[in-house]
C-alpha cells in the first residue's frame, strides 16, 4: 500500500515538474523595439518668449459681439457635446479596467433536488445512512445552498495595470481632443464672423460704386445730348452699372451663406446676427503676437493628444507581450448548504466552502497571441508616425503663417498707397471727362481699379486677421 502511494506521489511530482518546465518555457516573451523619435528630438529650440505668450481668447478678441457669439458656440455646439460623451466613455473604460484588477464577488442562491440510482455507489452507500438523527437520507434529496462566490485574476505581471494605464492615456487624449475642438471652434467662429464683416464692407463698397455708376450714366447721357460723346459711352456705363448690380446680389447671397454657417457653429437655426462692419477695418492686427516660440508647439492640444495616443499604444504592446506569461486565477466560495432550510443556521455543520487556484500558460499554438502582439506593435509604430506627422504639420503651419503675417503687413501698406493714388485718379478722370478731356474708357478703368483696390484692402485685412487666428488655432487658452 505504501509503495502504491509512493508511486502516485512520484507521478504527481513528475507532472508538477513537467508543468513547471512548460510554464517556464512559456514565459519567454517577445520584445517590441520602438525607434528613436528623431522628429521630436530635432525640433528647433525656441529662442524667445515663454508659455505665458498663449493668449486668453477673451483678451485676444476685444469685440463684445464676437465674444458673445463664441460663448454661445461653446455652450451649444453639437460637436462639443459629442466629444463630452466620448470623454465619458473613455472615463468609464478606466473604471472597467480598474475593476478587472479587483476580485469579483457574487451572491448566489441555489435550490434544487436530486435522486441517485439505487444500484450505484452513491445510491447503495446512502441506504440506511441517516441525514439527521433518526432520519435516513430521503430518496429525493433537496439541496438549498446560499453562498458567496469569489473570482480573482491576480495581476502577477502587471498586465491588467498596463491595460488600465492605456485606458488612462486614452482618456487624457480625449480631454485634449476636446480642447483641440474648443480651440478650433473659437477660431472658426471668429473667422466666420470676420468674413461676415468683410462681406458687409464689400457690399457697402459695391453700393457706393453702383451710385457712382448711376451718376456716370447720367453724365454720359448729358454728354451725348450735348454731342460731346457717343451712345457707345452711355451703353458702356450702363453695362458697368448692370455688372455692379449683379455683383451686389452675389455678395448678398454670400452674406446669407456665411451667416447661416456661423449660426450652425452656434448650434442654432438661422438667426440674423447683429454686427457693426466698422469692427473689421478698425481692428488693429497686433504684430507682437506674430512670433510663436516652437516650445509652445509641444503644448498644442492636438500634439499632446497624439502624444497620449502614442503612450496608450505603448501600454497596449506591454499588455500583448504579457499575454505570453502564465496567468493565476483564484476561485473561492463560502456559504451554507442543507437539505432543509431550518438546518441552514446550524453552524458550523451547515457551513460549506471551497478554494481553488489555477496557473495557466500558453504552450502550443500561440499564433493568436503572437498576432495580437504583432498588431499592437504595428499600432504603436503607427501612433509614433502619427505623432511625428502632427508635430511636423504644426511646425510647418507655424512657419508658413508667420511668414504670411509679415508679408501681408507689407502688402497692406502698399495697397493703402495704391488706394490713395487711385482715389485721386478717379476724381481727376471724372473732372477731365466732364470737360471732354478724358474718354469714358479712362473713367471706367480708373473707377473699376479703385473698386478692386478697395475690395482687396478689405480682403487683406481679413486675411491678416485669419492668419493670426490660424497661428493661434489650437493655442487659445479657454480660460475666462
Name each region found by the language model:
Residues 3, 28, 178-292, 404, ...:
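Periplasmic alpha-helical coiled-coil/stalk elements that build and connect Gram-negative outer-membrane
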Residues 2-75, 252-295, 341, 473-480:
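Terminal intrinsically disordered/low-complexity segments used for targeting and assembly
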Residues 217, 243-271, 417-477:
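Short segments within alpha-helical structural elements
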Residues 227-230, 394, 401, 436-440:
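Alpha-helical heptad-repeat coiled-coil segments that mediate oligomerization/polymerization in large
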Residues 82, 98, 154-182, 232, ...:
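Sec/SRP-type N-terminal targeting helices
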Residues 27-41, 74-155, 257-273, 292-371, ...:
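A small-residue-enriched
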Residues 66-68, 89, 143-145, 191, ...:
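Transmembrane beta-barrel architecture of outer-membrane proteins
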Amino acid at each position: 500500500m505504501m509503495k502504491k502511494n509512493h508511486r502516485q506521489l512520484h507521478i504527481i511530482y513528475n507532472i508538477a515538474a513537467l508543468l513547471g518546465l512548460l510554464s517556464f518555457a512559456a514565459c519567454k516573451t517577445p520584445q517590441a523595439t520602438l525607434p528613436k523619435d528623431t522628429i521630436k528630438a530635432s525640433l528647433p529650440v525656441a529662442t524667445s518668449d515663454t508659455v505665458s505668450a498663449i493668449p486668453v481668447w477673451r483678451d485676444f478678441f476685444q469685440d463684445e459681439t464676437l465674444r458673445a457669439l463664441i460663448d454661445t458656440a461653446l455652450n451649444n455646439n453639437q460637436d462639443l457635446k459629442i466629444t463630452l460623451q466620448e470623454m465619458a466613455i473613455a472615463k468609464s473604460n478606466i473604471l472597467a479596467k480598474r475593476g478587472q484588477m479587483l476580485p469579483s464577488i457574487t451572491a448566489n442562491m441555489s435550490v434544487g433536488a436530486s435522486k441517485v440510482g439505487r444500484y450505484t455507489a452513491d445510491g447503495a452507500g446512502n441506504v440506511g445512512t441517516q441525514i439527521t438523527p433518526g432520519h435516513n437520507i430521503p430518496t429525493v434529496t433537496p439541496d438549498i445552498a446560499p453562498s458567496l462566490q469569489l473570482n480573482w485574476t491576480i495581476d502577477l505581471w502587471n498586465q491588467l495595470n498596463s491595460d488600465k494605464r492605456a485606458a488612462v492615456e486614452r482618456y487624457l487624449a480625449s480631454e485634449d481632443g476636446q480642447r483641440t475642438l474648443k480651440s478650433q471652434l473659437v477660431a472658426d467662429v471668429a473667422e466666420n464672423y470676420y468674413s461676415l464683416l468683410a462681406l458687409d464692407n464689400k457690399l457697402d463698397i459695391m453700393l457706393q460704386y453702383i451710385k457712382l455708376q448711376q451718376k456716370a450714366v447720367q453724365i454720359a447721357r448729358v454728354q451725348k445730348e450735348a454731342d460731346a460723346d457717343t451712345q457707345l459711352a452711355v451703353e458702356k456705363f450702363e453695362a458697368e452699372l448692370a455688372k455692379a448690380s449683379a455683383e451686389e446680389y452675389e455678395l448678398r447671397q454670400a452674406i446669407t451663406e456665411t451667416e447661416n454657417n456661423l449660426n450652425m457653429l452656434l448650434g442654432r437655426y438661422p438667426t440674423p446676427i447683429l454686427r457693426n462692419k466698422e469692427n473689421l477695418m478698425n481692428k488693429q492686427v497686433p504684430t507682437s503676437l506674430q512670433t510663436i516660440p516652437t516650445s509652445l508647439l509641444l503644448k498644442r492640444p492636438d500634439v499632446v493628444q497624439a502624444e497620449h495616443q502614442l503612450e496608450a499604444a505603448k501600454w497596449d504592446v506591454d499588455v500583448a507581450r504579457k499575454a505570453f506569461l502564465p496567468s493565476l486565477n483564484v476561485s473561492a466560495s463560502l456559504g451554507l448548504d442543507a437539505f432543509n432550510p431550518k438546518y441552514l443556521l446550524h453552524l458550523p455543520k451547515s457551513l460549506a466552502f471551497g478554494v481553488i487556484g489555477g496557473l495557466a500558460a500558453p504552450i502550443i499554438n500561440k499564433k493568436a497571441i503572437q498576432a495580437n502582439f504583432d498588431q499592437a506593435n504595428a499600432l504603436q509604430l503607427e501612433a509614433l508616425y502619427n505623432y511625428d506627422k502632427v508635430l511636423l504639420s504644426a511646425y510647418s503651419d507655424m512657419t508658413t503663417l508667420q511668414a504670411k503675417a509679415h508679408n501681408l503687413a507689407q502688402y497692406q501698406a502698399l495697397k493703402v498707397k495704391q488706394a490713395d493714388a487711385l482715389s485721386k485718379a478717379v476724381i481727376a478722370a471724372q473732372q477731365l471727362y466732364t470737360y471732354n478731356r478724358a474718354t469714358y474708357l479712362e473713367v471706367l478703368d480708373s473707377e473699376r481699379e479703385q473698386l478692386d483696390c478697395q475690395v482687396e484692402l478689405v480682403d487683406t485685412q481679413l486675411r491678416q486677421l485669419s492668419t493670426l487666428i490660424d497661428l493661434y488655432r489650437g493655442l487659445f487658452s479657454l480660460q475666462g
